[in-house]
Amino acid sequence: MQVMNNETSHVIRFGDWSALSADAKAIRFEVFVAEQNVPAEIELDDMDAVCLHAVAYDGAGVPIGTGRLLPDGHIGRMAVRKTARGSGVGGALLQALMAQARARGDRRVVLSAQTHAAPFYQRHGFSIAGDEFYEAGIAHIDMQLTFA
């Protein structure tokens, strides 16, 4: 399945790990491992195999953003390449993953945001649902959104 966004001329493709792993992994390693110094050995986990993955592609077909939706309604591994930040790709990915969760019957979605990104998620309707904690040496905060 794919979603077109004409405003920013990108396409979002959904699939399982076998279909999207090469592109999702490339983005995640660029953002989390290379930029944020997350250890490579903890970036990939067993949950990738059971998630619905989303990858955004620019007009030339280059992968520029990714995220995943776990079976329990947790959105995670949201990452956008530096060159595409500020273009609306992150918001489009988030909204697309939320729509997938809602369509399958989830009543709410949750995520663990890097603290500096909390305002981004709040603009999309998420509220803070816990205290700050550290994961891979990076400050995070749990957030949630309940569908109306």
Predicted regions mapped to residue ranges:
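Short amphipathic alpha-helix that is part of the acyltransferase structural core
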Residues: 2-53, 57-62, 74
